[in-house]
């Protein structure tokens, strides 16, 4: 089997984890106590769910996951919640004091007390696998645990499991709304430290998802549960090909092969469609062409940036449900004729397609409509550099005055790390810029480059 271990770090990671596992259980017909009712009619007789769940002798299905937070409150909610008996107590790891939105606490002081325990628990999960594919790491950029502890763990995972794929789902700080003043510091420090250890990082930003909930689902004041359920759908679409059988299945490493043209340029944009409320779905059936088109609308994206200002390097379309290759090819052909979608000239084809026959599942009583087909688009576009530029600018404003820096230095960080991280991100912005330049113009410079 090709197992995948999910690692959920910090409040954002753990709460997205809750939404994801709730959804996986529904999709595979696994009850909150881990039992799978004997009628196997739900998932067919295949056990492809074992990429994400391990089965115990007593017939319980346990997620291959660990939840880690440096303070206990968020994980305590799992320990007492509906899914408390789904997880083994050893999979829920908590510290005593939190990282206080401070990267340095998550990475150095508080983080290092819990890292060995965490690696030990991950090792136990890994030993339980026959052919581990890799890790999915869920975290936010802005929090102390999400930024600091994640980067520490990624470094250690690279050492222990060298060649295994590591994919991240990261909550990027939203442009307007902020949960912490020091988000730009944490984000840039963690991006710098994890850049060489992560193979592919799917970013979502809360503001973009708020807007989608407001616009498409008519939720006036979206809660984190609303946001996370939507993120859960995306994660589920991306991992569906690992958990179910389909016409064109996509493996973890296959994502990277098709989406990451250069090692550093590994931040695809995620877009999911259709996001419609149950009331609307009752009146409209969306065709393959329509949902595919919706993916190219900037307001359906999970990060605020405008792909019309950038160029696409690669696009991965993951369909699920009632979809046949013929419709997909027709939809893609139509999109290619539209001039608004620009590809870099060195990547002419650029579309990778996955089709999975398992229709999308929704959480009962949730806001999303049950639809016969859905698509998740992962696109590597130069437009995402806008998001970095925005963050770098915020970083510069604070760092010019050395605001808040003493909190980091006090936890054992050196001030040089800030400027080093900032330079690395400036280089990343430059990388994106160069990738978008047409190859005809820069033939003369090729020599200096390497």
UniProtKB/Swiss-Prot annotation:
- Site described as Involved in polymerization, located at 450
Q: Which GO terms describe its biological process?
A: microtubule-based process
Any one GO CC term of the record? cytoplasm
Q: Which GO terms describe its molecular function?
A: GTP binding; hydrolase activity; metal ion binding; structural constituent of cytoskeleton
Primary location recorded for the protein, binned into one broad class: cytoplasm
Q: Entry's InterPro entries?
A: Alpha_tubulin, Tub_FtsZ_C, Tubulin, Tubulin/FtsZ-like_C, Tubulin/FtsZ_2-layer-sand-dom, Tubulin/FtsZ_GTPase_sf, Tubulin_C, Tubulin_CS
* UniProt keywords, alphabetically: Acetylation, Cytoplasm, Cytoskeleton, GTP-binding, Hydrolase, Magnesium, Metal-binding, Microtubule, Nucleotide-binding
Q: Which residues bind GTP?
A: 11, 71, 140, 144-145, 179, 206, 228
Task: Name the Pfam families for this protein.
Answer: Tubulin, Tubulin_C
Catalytic activity from the UniProt record:
GTP + H2O = GDP + phosphate + H(+)
Q: List the disulfide bonds.
A: none
Q: Which residues are the active-site ones? A: 254
Q: What cofactors does the UniProt entry give for this protein?
A: Mg(2+)
In this chain, Mg(2+) is annotated as bound at 71
Q: Which CDD domains does the protein's record reference?
A: alpha_tubulin
- State its location(s): Cytoplasm, Cytoskeleton
Enzyme Commission identifier(s): 3.6.5.-
| Top-rank taxon | Eukaryota
- What quaternary arrangement does the UniProt entry report? Dimer of alpha and beta chains. A typical microtubule is a hollow water-filled tube with an outer diameter of 25 nm and an inner diameter of 15 nM. Alpha-beta heterodimers associate head-to-tail to form protofilaments running lengthwise along the microtubule wall with the beta-tubulin subunit facing the microtubule plus end conferring a structural polarity. Microtubules usually have 13 protofilaments but different protofilament numbers can be found in some organisms and specialized cells.
The entry's family comment says: Belongs to the tubulin family.
- Protein name as catalogued: Tubulin alpha chain
Per the UniProt entry, what species is this protein from, by scientific name?
Haemonchus contortus (Barber pole worm)
